[in-house]
C-alpha cells in the first residue's frame, strides 16, 4: 500500500480505500464535489448540517440550510449512490454564530457570521464528526485552493477570482488545513461547475446560488436582531462630528459604517455618511466622505498562516483586504503579540468597520497568510 501512487486527494492508496466526508449544503458546488469524488471511486459520505430553522421564511430562493436544501442534498446522494446524513447543529450554531452576530450589531459592529460558521461549526465540530466517521479527509465546495508547500499545506486563492472565498476562510488553522480538501478551487469559472453537475445528471445543476446569510431571510438584519434582542431598535440622535444634532434615527442596528442613503437628513449641503456608531449613547455619527478615510487598522484574534511566526519580524509587507468585495491593497503588519497587530494601509480605505475581517495575502502570490478581526480604534 505504501508504494501506491498518490490519489487525487493526496493519499497513497486507491480511492475505494479512501473515505471522504463531503459537507453538503444542497447547492450545486458541494453537490459537484460529492458527485466527482463518488465517480472517481472514493468512499464518499455526505453530511448536511441543519443549522437554522426560520420556518417558511427560509423556504425561498437565495437562502441556504432550509428544508429544501436538505432534500436536494439527499437527492444528489441517491443519484450518485452514497450515504447521506443530516446532523442537527441548531443549538451549536445559535451559540457559536447567531448570538455573537446579534451582540456585535448591538455594539455598533458589522459582523461576518459566515466566517464564524466556518471557524466554529463547519471546520470544528463537523470536521471532528468526519474524523469520528473514520474519514481520511473532509471536502467542501468552497472556492479556494490547498497547495503543498515546503512547510506543509498552504491556503491559496481560487483560480476564479470572481468566486474566490479566501476572505471567509482566513481563520482555517494549519491543523484543519491538513484534513481539508477543496476540489473546486482550480476551476476557471462557475460555468465549469454547472457543466459538471449536468454531466452527472444532478438535480441541482440549475439551482440558483445562495445570496442571503442563512438565518437572515431577505437580507433584513435589523428584523432578525429585533427578534433575537427585543428592544434593540431604540431610536436616538443623528449627530455630526461636532456633536450637533441633525435628526433622529430608527435604531443603531439599522445603520452601517459608510452608509449614505436612508439617513433622512437630506438638504444639508454636501453628502453625509455614517462614520461611527455609538450604541451606548444611541448615536449615529455622520460626516463628509473624507472622514471615512482609514489608514491604521487594529486587528485581533489573528490566525497566522505564514511559515515563520508572526512575531518573528517587527514588520510584514503584505496585501490586505478589509472587506469581502474589495481587492487586496498594499499594507504593513506590525505585530503586537501572536494574535494582535496594527495594520497600516499604504493607501487609505473608506468605510473600514469594526466586526469585519482583515485578511492578509503574500505580495505577488496567491497565498493567504491569515487574517484577523478589525476592532474599535481604526483611524
UniProtKB/Swiss-Prot annotation:
tRNA processing is among the record's keywords: yes
Segments crossing the lipid bilayer: none
Paired cysteines (S-S): 117-214
Enzyme Commission designation: 2.8.1.13
Gene Ontology CC, one term: cytoplasm
Region (Interaction with tRNA), start-end ranges: 163-165
Catalytic center residues: 117, 214
Gene Ontology annotations of biological process type: tRNA wobble position uridine thiolation
Catalytic activity: S-sulfanyl-L-cysteinyl-[protein] + uridine(34) in tRNA + AH2 + ATP = 2-thiouridine(34) in tRNA + L-cysteinyl-[protein] + A + AMP + diphosphate + H(+)
Residues bound to ATP: 23-30, 49, 141
Keyword annotations of the record: ATP-binding, Cytoplasm, Disulfide bond, Nucleotide-binding, RNA-binding, Transferase, tRNA processing, tRNA-binding
Site positions (Interaction with tRNA): 142, 356
HAMAP family for the chain: tRNA_thiouridyl_MnmA
Family, per entry: Belongs to the MnmA/TRMU family.
Biological function: Catalyzes the 2-thiolation of uridine at the wobble position (U34) of tRNA, leading to the formation of s(2)U34.
The protein's name in its UniProt record: tRNA-specific 2-thiouridylase MnmA
Organism of origin: Cereibacter sphaeroides (strain ATCC 17029 / ATH 2.4.9)
Amino acid at each position: 500500500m505504501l508504494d501506491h501512487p498518490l490519489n487525487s486527494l493526496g493519499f497513497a492508496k486507491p480511492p475505494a480505500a479512501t473515505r471522504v466526508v463531503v459537507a453538503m449544503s444542497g447547492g450545486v458546488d458541494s453537490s459537484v464535489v460529492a458527485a466527482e469524488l463518488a465517480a472517481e471511486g472514493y468512499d464518499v459520505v455526505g453530511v448536511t448540517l441543519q443549522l437554522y430553522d426560520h420556518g417558511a421564511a427560509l423556504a425561498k430562493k437565495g437562502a441556504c440550510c432550509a428544508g429544501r436544501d436538505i432534500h436536494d442534498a439527499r437527492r444528489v446522494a441517491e443519484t450518485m449512490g452514497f450515504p447521506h446524513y443530516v446532523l442537527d447543529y441548531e443549538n451549536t450554531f445559535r451559540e457559536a454564530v447567531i448570538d455573537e452576530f446579534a451582540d456585535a450589531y448591538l455594539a455598533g459592529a458589522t459582523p461576518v457570521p459566515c466566517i464564524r460558521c466556518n471557524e466554529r461549526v463547519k471546520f470544528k465540530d463537523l470536521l471532528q464528526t468526519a474524523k469520528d466517521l473514520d474519514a481520511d479527509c473532509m471536502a467542501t465546495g468552497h472556492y479556494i485552493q490547498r497547495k503543498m508547500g515546503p512547510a506543509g499545506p498552504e491556503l491559496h486563492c481560487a483560480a476564479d477570482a470572481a468566486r474566490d472565498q479566501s476572505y471567509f476562510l482566513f481563520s482555517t488553522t494549519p491543523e484543519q488545513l491538513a484534513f481539508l480538501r477543496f476540489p473546486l478551487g482550480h476551476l476557471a469559472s462557475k460555468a465549469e461547475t454547472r457543466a459538471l453537475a449536468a454531466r452527472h445528471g444532478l438535480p441541482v445543476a440549475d439551482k440558483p446560488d445562495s445570496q442571503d446569510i442563512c438565518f437572515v431571510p431577505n437580507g433584513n438584519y435589523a428584523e432578525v436582531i429585533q427578534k433575537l434582542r427585543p428592544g434593540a431598535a431604540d431610536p436616538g440622535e443623528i449627530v455630526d462630528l461636532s456633536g450637533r444634532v441633525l435628526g433622529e434615527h430608527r435604531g443603531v442596528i439599522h445603520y452601517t459604517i459608510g452608509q449614505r442613503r436612508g439617513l433622512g437628513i437630506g438638504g444639508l449641503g454636501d453628502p453625509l455618511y455614517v462614520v461611527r456608531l455609538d450604541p451606548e449613547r444611541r448615536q449615529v455619527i455622520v460626516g463628509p466622505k473624507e472622514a471615512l478615510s482609514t489608514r491604521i487598522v487594529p486587528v485581533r484574534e489573528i490566525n497566522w498562516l505564514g511559515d515563520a511566526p508572526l512575531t518573528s519580524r517587527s514588520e510584514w509587507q503584505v496585501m490586505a483586504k478589509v472587506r469581502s468585495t474589495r481587492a487586496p491593497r498594499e499594507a504593513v503588519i506590525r505585530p503586537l503579540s501572536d494574535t494582535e497587530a496594527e495594520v497600516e494601509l499604504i493607501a487609505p480605505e473608506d468605510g473600514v468597520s469594526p466586526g469585519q475581517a482583515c485578511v492578509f495575502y503574500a505580495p505577488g502570490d496567491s497565498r493567504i497568510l491569515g487574517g484577523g478581526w478589525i476592532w474599535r480604534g481604526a483611524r
